Amino acid sequence: DIVLTQSPASLAVSLGQRATISCRASESVDNYGISFMNWFQQKPGQPPKLLIYAASNQGSGVPARFSGSGSGTDFSLNIHPMEEDDTAMYFCQQSKEVPPYTFGGGTKLEIK
């Protein structure tokens, strides 16, 4: 299975500043010219919400302050400017080799 290592495990960012979350895959998640890396946001008591798919494409209704980048094994999620509503857990997920759809360990994002 592809292992995803996410960092940092927790992050505190001031309102209006930039939050950057990284995800490294144990092998490339690229295929057919597409990076099969996705990002999810999860708030307590709610199902995960798809933010970014195929490394850099925004999910439906996702604000422009969320962006993704990367290819191969190294990816990042950027949130800028940080808003109060962005406090949540964030997870990367690979969808190149399925099943299983493996996830990173998660990043807890809070307001500083």
From Swiss-Prot:
Pfam families linked: V-set (PF07686)
SMART domains registered for this protein in UniProt: IG, IGv
Sorted UniProt keywords: Adaptive immunity, Disulfide bond, Immunity, Immunoglobulin
Highest taxon of the lineage: Eukaryota
Gene3D superfamilies referenced in this protein's UniProt entry, alphabetically: Immunoglobulins
Region (Framework-1): 1-23
Chain residue ranges for the region called Complementarity-determining-3: 93-102
Annotated segments matching region Framework-4: 103-112
SUPFAM superfamilies linked to this entry: Immunoglobulin
Region (Complementarity-determining-1): 24-38
Segments of this protein annotated with the region Framework-3: 61-92
Region (Framework-2): 39-53
GO CC terms in record: immunoglobulin complex
Region (Complementarity-determining-2): 54-60
Keyword Disulfide bond annotated: yes
PANTHER family: IMMUNOGLOBULIN LIGHT CHAIN (PTHR23267)
Protein name as it appears in the record: Ig kappa chain V-III region PC 7132
